[in-house]
Each structure stands twice: as C-alpha cells, then as structure tokens.
Amino acid sequence: MFADIAVQHWAFAVYVVGAICICLTMIGLAALLGGRAYGRAKNKPFESGVDSVGNARLRFSAKFYLVAMFFVIFDVEALYLFAWSVSVRESGWVGFIEATIFISLLLVGLIYLWRIGALDWAPKKRVLTDKKPD
C-alpha cells in the first residue's frame, strides 16, 4: 500500500525536496559569502542618523482598517463569482439563481455599509464646510 502511494506521488516528493534544498543553499551561501561587520554601533537600530524622539507607535485611523477589510471581503467575493463564471454552463439555471442571490446579498451589504456611513471617508461636518459656494 505504501509503495502505491509512493509511486503516485514521487514527483511531488522530488519537488518538496528540491525546494528545501534550494532554500537551504541560499541561506548557507548568504551566511558564507555575506559581509560581516561587528561593532557596538551595529547593534543599534537604524534611525536615518537622527536620534529617535517620542513614542514609535503611531495610531492609524480606523478608516484605513475599514478600507482593508472591505477590500478583502469584496475581493474574496469576486473570486467566488469568477469561479462561478468559469463553470456557468455546467451549473445551469440553478447556478445562475444562486449567483443572483449571492450578488443580491452583496448589494444589500454594500447598501447597508453606505447607509451607516462606513464608506464615508471624511466626517459629515467637514464635507459640508468644504463645499464651494455656487
């Protein structure tokens, strides 16, 4: 039984062993051929020649995280739609109805996010004051 599995998957085993060998070779050559500079100054973090002042932790607005989450969510949904579009002939009308329901749920979610203001980048107060008078 093990022989049958080994015969079927020998190419994958060769690929894995080759990938591991290439990685180990690159790490070994970098360790052997890489430049070495020891000293007290090398242990300090690089700050572009300027002594660091203050806290290194910067706070980002939650809007950046929202944009990233929306991108991931809608990108994954686009992958599902792409997979459906490749097999649209095999799935027939049932697949079409399922894709329509899926797209409808996406639109409902997008409308909900738009209504609660999650897609507004600037606060309402600033948007209203930045408009130019006609």
Swiss-Prot record:
Q: What is its EC number?
A: 7.1.1.-
Reaction(s) the record says it catalyses = a quinone + NADH + 5 H(+)(in) = a quinol + NAD(+) + 4 H(+)(out)
**What Gene Ontology terms describe what this protein does at the molecular function level?**
NADH dehydrogenase (ubiquinone) activity; NADH:ubiquinone reductase (non-electrogenic) activity; quinone binding
- The main location is membrane
A single Pfam family it belongs to is Oxidored_q4
Task: Please give, as recorded in its UniProt entry, the membrane topology of this protein.
Answer: Multi-pass membrane protein
Q: Where in the cell is it found?
A: Cell inner membrane
Q: Does the keyword Acetylation apply?
A: no
- Its EC top class is translocase
The portions of this protein that span the membrane are 12-32, 64-84, 93-113
Q: Which of UniProt's keywords are assigned here?
A: Cell inner membrane, Cell membrane, Membrane, NAD, Quinone, Translocase, Transmembrane, Transmembrane helix, Transport, Ubiquinone
**InterPro entries for this protein:** NAD(P)H_OxRDtase_bac/plastid (IPR023043), NADH_UbQ/plastoQ_OxRdtase_su3 (IPR000440), NDAH_ubi_oxred_su3_sf (IPR038430)
Give a GO cellular-component term.
plasma membrane
Q: Which segments of the protein form a coiled coil according to its record?
A: none
Q: Does this UniProt record's set of keywords contain Chloroplast?
A: no
Function, as annotated, reads: NDH-1 shuttles electrons from NADH, via FMN and iron-sulfur (Fe-S) centers, to quinones in the respiratory chain. The immediate electron acceptor for the enzyme in this species is believed to be ubiquinone. Couples the redox reaction to proton translocation (for every two electrons transferred, four hydrogen ions are translocated across the cytoplasmic membrane), and thus conserves the redox energy in a proton gradient.
What's this protein's family per the entry? Belongs to the complex I subunit 3 family.
| Subunit-structure text | NDH-1 is composed of 14 different subunits. Subunits NuoA, H, J, K, L, M, N constitute the membrane sector of the complex.
Q: Supply the name of the protein.
A: NADH-quinone oxidoreductase subunit A
Which organism is this entry from?
Aeromonas hydrophila subsp. hydrophila (strain ATCC 7966 / DSM 30187 / BCRC 13018 / CCUG 14551 / JCM 1027 / KCTC 2358 / NCIMB 9240 / NCTC 8049)
Gene behind this protein: nuoA
